[in-house]
Amino acid sequence: MAHKKAGGSTRNGRDSEAKRLGVKRFGGEAVLAGSIIVRQRGTKFHAGTNVGCGRDHTLFALADGKVKFEVKGPNNRKFISIEAE
């Protein structure tokens, strides 16, 4: 015979999987065309020269070269460009 009252149920125990967002290639790093530079939600970084923007706002290299981060415009937007070699 059990001498322990039944435990109540919990409403915890769920958490979403991490999405591995962030900068994948940093300033000055050499990249090949097609390399992912940044995975992001929304446009924290904008695509500059030789950089493409995917459906999920992923920035990727369109040409081989070096990654360059720059702040431009009246709103101080962050742009990522590739300086072709």
UniProtKB/Swiss-Prot annotation:
Region of interest (Disordered), residue spans: 1-20
Coiled-coil intervals: none
Annotated GO biological process: translation
Pfam families referenced in this protein's UniProt entry, alphabetically: Ribosomal_L27
Keywords (A to Z) from UniProt: Ribonucleoprotein, Ribosomal protein
A Gene Ontology molecular function term of the record: structural constituent of ribosome
NCBIfam families with a match to the protein in the record: L27
HAMAP family: Ribosomal_bL27
Similarity comment: Belongs to the bacterial ribosomal protein bL27 family.
Name of the protein: Large ribosomal subunit protein bL27
